[in-house]
Amino acid sequence: MHDYQKAFIEFAIQREVLKFGQFTLKSGRSSPYFFNAGLFNTSTTLAQIGHFYAAALTSSPLQYDMLFGPAYKGIPLVSALAVTLANEKSMDVPYAFNRKEAKAHGEGGVIVGAPLKGKVLIVDDVITAGTAIREVISIIKANGAEPAGVLIALDRQERGQHQLSAIQEIEQNYQIPVTAIIQLDQILEFLKSDPHFSDNYKQVAEYRAVYGVQS
């Protein structure tokens, strides 16, 4: 586990973005942990999340020409990442995001920001069913650009109705990489290293054994 990953887990727990207990997911499964990126909702947390996304991006082999944030949660995330790359890496990276509905007046269309061209890296919080990512990939291709990959905060490493996770399906169907700041395996490693979380480690490990995908 990289230092930035450990720091991100600690930060997420501190901000109660990552919680442990019993939570019912949209799938109906009872999960021993819950991750709510919507709680990164202050200026300080937004600056911090931009730093963690940038750390994951620069540690990855992802190649890209610009950034794209799917509406709505991806919009502040891609903005925070773009600002962090400028401040910490002196990189001037174009970015854009989409509207849920096309605008008929003014500049019109569904895209806000830089024109979509070249290799486009999609930035979002998590991938659950993958519907939003598939829609964005269609938008990118329709504009003559190429989806270069997806950068998210957490990979739950959890299968859907079949044997693959939504992330694995995206990777297979579109032949693009999905990179996460952390995976569930890193959360387990963190919990195992701290006796305070021994009960949580056991519960999350059992959940991973039942619903997890092969890493």
Swiss-Prot record:
Catalyzes the transfer of a ribosyl phosphate group from 5-phosphoribose 1-diphosphate to orotate, leading to the formation of orotidine monophosphate (OMP). GO terms for molecular function: magnesium ion binding; orotate phosphoribosyltransferase activity. GO terms for cellular component: cytoplasm. Belongs to the purine/pyrimidine phosphoribosyltransferase family. PyrE subfamily. Coiled coil: none annotated. This is Orotate phosphoribosyltransferase. GO terms for biological process: 'de novo' pyrimidine nucleobase biosynthetic process; 'de novo' UMP biosynthetic process; pyrimidine ribonucleoside biosynthetic process. Transmembrane segments: none annotated. The lineage of its organism: Bacteria, Pseudomonadati, Pseudomonadota, Gammaproteobacteria, Oceanospirillales.
